[in-house]
Amino acid sequence: MSLQLDSVKNRQKSWKSYILTIIAILMILGGVYLLVLIGTPLILSQNINPKDNHTTQLITKTENKITENRLYIPKIDINLPYSTGGAETMEHGAWWRKPENGNPKDGGNFVLSAHRFIMGLTPQQTLRKSPFYNIDKLTVGDEIIIDYNGVRYNYVIIEKQSVKPDAVEIEQRTDQPQLTLYSCTLGGANDGRDVIIAKLKK
């Protein structure tokens, strides 16, 4: 009888040990996958050729057939639609903030914002949801291209700023035609904003 009890106890211990091992393995794999999701934008950005990437090729192909409003940043391989509306527009591209304050055709301050980092369920989804992840890699002199209402506008970056989250002045109308791009810092929405200011090329 005691042998049978010992055998049952040993089997129970064996099952518990097996289950704990499976749980530990799943937790380790989950942690590794989480690191992959978090690191995807950073890892892939190391391989961007600023002179020859998907965006630079697309700009050349679409020059004579502009069909939608888009933002292109060749240096960091950004190719995004933009639209007015609310924050939900950033799920599919960039958000045109304060349209009444400016646009490429009429001048003023044309302001676009997009997510810096949003984790998706897959590496591809994380990359798609985090278009401005590499906005900090832009420098003065870099080119930004805007397609607006069937016309292509070329801008050059003249300034970079870091501002507080409540710095609403970055969206105010300007006397000169200006493009303003901004996104949260990697520290999050409460940490601040990285701002890019560009002027229209003549």
Question: Can you say where each PLM-predicted feature lies in the sequence?
Answer:
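Solvent-exposed, non-transmembrane regions of membrane-associated and secreted proteins
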Residues: 15-21, 28-202
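N-terminal Lys/Arg-rich, disordered targeting/topogenic segments
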Residues: 1-19
